[in-house]
Amino acid sequence: MAPLRGAELVQTPLQLYRYLLRCCRQLPTKGIQEHYKHAVRQSFQVHSDEDNPERIQQIIRRAIEDADWIMNKYKKQN
């Protein structure tokens, strides 16, 4: 199960970025939200020069899986 509705519609890096920032807003505390927002921004800077479409899709899939894991982690703690 994806952390937010619309995960299946994410096709581009910009859509992924916006999706992940929306996921961050669902996290329980401001400190945790800021931590993951920073991680999202750093990941986008690291992968900004990626131009292989297959690799981009792989990164998108993995980022959504990671977001799902993080959302479930904090859901179980509360």
UniProtKB/Swiss-Prot annotation:
Family to which this protein belongs: Belongs to the complex I LYR family. LYRM9 subfamily.
Protein name from the UniProt record: LYR motif-containing protein 9
Organism placement in taxonomy: Eukaryota, Metazoa, Chordata, Craniata, Vertebrata
InterPro entries: Complex1_LYR_dom (IPR008011), Complex1_LYR_LYRM9 (IPR045291), Complex_I_LYR (IPR052151)
Encoding gene (name): Lyrm9
Protein's organism: Rattus norvegicus
Source organism superkingdom: Eukaryota
